[in-house]
């Protein structure tokens, strides 16, 4: 994930959201006064939600017989939002990846399929390219 330069927005209070396998979370993202504020998530079954303007949807597709699950991210926010996704089994961290925000197309990345839940955290305004890692 890219290190934010002074003046770039960061999420307030280390905001995090959790998503479980086979589910997706849709949440509002507001950028104001140099801060990113996250709205409460709407949890739904995978593939049933689309973000409205100002929202992001993140879904976790189980990996089946592969060692990786797929994270699907669709953004309709005012600016691309980069964030980290951390996979957990109970309280044990097993994987962590950076997701680069894109407004022009959905993003799909891999995370360990054994993750019972995925914590979305360290939100920051991105550049809209695949180089936030």
For the regions a protein language model found, what residue spans apply to each?
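Membrane engagement elements in two modes
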Residues: 1-68, 115-133
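Coil-to-beta-strand transition motifs
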Residues: 66, 78-81
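Asparagine-centered strand-capping/turn motif at beta-strand->loop junctions
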Residues: 71-79
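Short acidic, flexible loop segments centered on an aromatic residue
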Residues: 81-94
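Solvent-exposed serine/threonine-rich low-complexity stretches and specific carbohydrate-binding patches
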Residues: 95-108
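Short, hydrophobic beta-strand segments
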Residues: 109-114
